[in-house]
């Protein structure tokens, strides 16, 4: 089946603007235009339902229901439980909060692995855990290809490693990492995985359950939605980590 590009473009009000007609935008890294369905829903929310949700009056009930619909729908797309989907201001901020939770859960001597193929969002917050007594190890790219080799990961894994953070797709060399293979190796060593899907999600909707990732992060404002970060975290792992909210 051929993709009807004209139909696709018609779903985005931005492209009805004269100054944008006939143009293609490759700026997902910074954000994408929202489709009409998203804009309409946000307009309805701000006009009719911007109240405390789950209350006893109509606007509050309806607003809460729409929030639940968004979570349930997204969970279905991603192949996970509703309770495993969280919303935040951005992937960078979600990762920061997540790192603070791990900082309280990890003990001195525990190790985490980060890569030098990652965007800063999935490496900076984790690297700073070294100030809390956590051993931070770097899974380095092959200098010739820019890719991450699984053999190098194996050399870093041991019983002390509790978390491995890496990108689904590099935003520098565009290499798609073999997430399922990496997850299998890390789980066999007793660790968890945190996958940054920001550069992958706009091009291939991930089935997180199939990938096996314990944590999967991406940004809805880079996938034609509102300015939010999406975090999937497996229920059993979420229950282990100290709560960072109120």
Please provide the spans of the model-predicted regions.
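Pyridoxal 5′-phosphate
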Residues: 1-246
């Amino acid at each position: 089946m051929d993709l009807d590009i004209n139909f696709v473009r018609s779903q985005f009000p931005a492209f009805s603007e004269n100054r944008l007609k006939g143009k293609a935008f490759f700026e997902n890294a910074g954000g994408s235009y929202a489709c009409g369905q998203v804009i309409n829903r946000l307009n309805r929310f701000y006009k009719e339902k911007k109240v405390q949700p789950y209350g006893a009056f109509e606007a509050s009930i309806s607003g809460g229901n729409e929030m639940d619909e968004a979570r349930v729908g997204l969970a279905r797309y991603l192949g996970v439980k509703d309770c495993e989907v969280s919303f935040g201001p951005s992937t960078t901020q979600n990762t920061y909060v997540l790192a603070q939770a791990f900082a309280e859960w990890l003990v001195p001597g525990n190790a985490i692995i980060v890569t030098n193929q990652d965007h800063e969002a999935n490496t900076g917050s984790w690297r700073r855990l070294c100030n809390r007594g956590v051993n931070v190890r770097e899974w380095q790219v092959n200098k010739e290809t820019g890719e991450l080799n699984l053999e190098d990961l194996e050399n870093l894994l041991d019983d002390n490693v509790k978390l491995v953070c890496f990108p689904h797709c590099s935003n520098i060399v565009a290499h798609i990492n073999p997430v399922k293979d990496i997850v299998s190796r890390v789980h066999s060593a007793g660790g968890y995985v945190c996958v940054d899907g920001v550069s992958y999600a706009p091009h291939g909707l991930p089935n997180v359950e199939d990938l096996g990732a314990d944590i999967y992060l991406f940004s809805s404002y880079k996938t034609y939605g509102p300015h939010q970060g999406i975090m999937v975290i497996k229920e059993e792992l979420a229950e282990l980590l100290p709560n960072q909210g109120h």
